[in-house]
Amino acid sequence: HIHIDARDLFYKELKGMLLVGKKAEKFIYSMLPPSRETSNWCKKLPMSVESILCIKSDSDFIDLWYDSCEASRSMDKYNEARYHGMNMHARVYLGSVEFRYHSGTNNPIKIKNWMYVCQSITRTGIMLGKALCKDKSALTPFEKRLIDVYTKPYDNEYTYKDFIETLELPLEVSGYVDMRRELFKEHYIVSQSL
């Protein structure tokens, strides 16, 4: 799994990361073996976009995370709240955000590209979290797009183009994601029709 240092991130940035992660999950799972989507070790984020948007403090963030995960608030490493693709229990316990979606590998190409995706989700989430606190007149066009894309309540409004462009994935990484999605396309098409 990938851990990203989050000791200097608080509810605003973590809220942004949850919003980005919530929307990005469908494309993340589509590039991974089907077993990852059904695994108990990297479950989907359990909270809604609407509930994430209601986070107004660090305590709201903690309450939403543990309540949505139906887990107790604890410093125990093996707390049930950790078994999500984006593990925010690690932020409380270790000071990092853990990305658990990807299966284990020692393939350097997979590792490099997956790290880039995780770093991009983190960077985009931080930007979004800060943009949500700004006066609307001070927002850049990109910040406006982030707010528009990641605060819509419905998942079907988030496109693959949004995923690639808002995460600012370079051609090499987006090509890798395309290749992985093609590899698991048959499963993805079937699971979308169920």
What are these regions (language model features)?
Residues 7-194:
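C-terminal accessory/tail domains of diverse enzymes
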